[in-house]
């Protein structure tokens, strides 16, 4: 499992892609803009392809990689506090392995921020420094770090709040995992290559209890990465301020990200990456799994007008967990769900997605694009309403590709674990839609 950034292109927001490998959602709902630390930006799920042969075997091919990204649009050199995760939040990756729109496995991540109280002798006094580092950093739990981030991982089987809970551990049995500090700059962490070497030290081999024999191993990493979602947010949200002919030409798919120079790709996110044996994720003979990520906050928050010394000590949080962010398929809450229901969608569960069906079957985006690109709501919008094709892509999966045998309509990212992985060099960035175009088909 490697975590080098590879751009994943949203080549054209006009296409609803049925690709079970990508998603995106940056600051998409009113409430989540007030809590960026729990704003889920992307969810990826795919068969691991590290070291696989051209026939899809070998290497890490028996594993599934799940990546949940949070905290969008992190500016480089965003100090002095940078982008630590929220210790008062619960970050989760959920798996439905029977097709009933309910989680049957959940991986829970909780974070702890340890202030080391680094101080310097200034005259006769020892005075705390104002930075999160006191010198160069190159190792796990480096002595020069004034703030150490760590996290725990638990696996829950069954309902996320009522199921059986077990600790995911390092291979030595320890339950605490370390997170690399965000990239501060070259003097603290060296150049890009040096930072990558430092970050790679925070990829840990893990043991997952309750998995079938020989399938209980995996890897985990949490840390800052360059945003891999390629889209020019400015032109897109400025009423798609680009020529329609350019946007609709599949030959321009690589230009959308400007070779990694699109505005969003000049920012960072915080990645939660987990690699698990596919045999641990599936149930019975069903090979299709559905995945999504959520973040939750405590129901009650008490602000302290006179906080004690410490780190993030201005609030006390308590009560039940309340889900405030949800992400599965690409761009659903960003471009499909109507503005009045965006917060509702973020708080909802897949099993209740019937309440949002009209947004999928009668989408407004094609009409908006017609207005902005051709001065007519009907100029570009398909007339095959209701859009059962979109319901298939987003809510049930595509037959023969990623549809479970007994599919309850729900918005989750689906992956058929029986389909072999493809080496990176021969992958199609547009997934199923890209393959249709490659063989001469047409997009609906």
PLM regions and their residue ranges:
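Gram-negative bacterial Sec-dependent N-terminal signal peptides
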Residues: 2-22
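Surface-exposed extracytoplasmic segments
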Residues: 22-444
